[in-house]
């Protein structure tokens, strides 16, 4: 983990301000796919599901951690669903919200199969025991006590989104709620070598809808189709 610090370099009568990085922690326990401020003394890190060495209390690899900015100590916290390529922002009440992500995965980011040969997209998927994150709305509520900071991350929550979103966009609104826009229905990249005959739905792999989440935690509402334009 790096911290940017400023130093004043004297050169004759002129002084210049130089920014430089210094290492403050050798191991953040998880890669910072997402990084934010949870309170005045704590930063949160959110990674995709992968086989990080440090395990949490649940036995899963750590893909979420907290960093104390006073001494740069790091501790892992539990997360349940796969937030790979999710979107996040701050609600008007100070909570941090992370929506969408990828399906449950195994080694190498691949999906596993059920005993009947069907794909196990929901999870839990061995060896990480992760759950599908594509419809999940995760929340970290503000708390001055860093020991009480945690992710509300429930695969089967009644407050999940109405449809799956991988790589969506999210934007805060003036009333403190957020709008969630678009995304794909599952993770992955398709480099087409043929015309896109379905620019709106991309033959079921696109989610051309917008949804609104209010800061009280109501289920996403006001879904409308978006127009997709291609040249």
What is each model feature region?
Residues 71-109, 114-123:
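Blade-loop segments of beta-propeller domains
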Residues 41-76, 109-117, 129:
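Beta-propeller domains
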Residues 38-40, 91-93, 172-175:
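Residue-level detector of Asp-centered blade-edge/turn motifs that repeat once per structural unit
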Residues 16-24, 71-80, 140-161, 202-223:
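Blade-edge beta-strand/turn elements of extracellular beta-propeller
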Residues 24-59, 84-86:
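Beta-strand-rich domains and repeat architectures in extracellular enzymes and scaffolds
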Residues 62-68, 132-144, 194-210:
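Beta-propeller blade signature
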Residues 224-231:
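Conserved small/polar residues in nucleotide/adenosyl-binding loops
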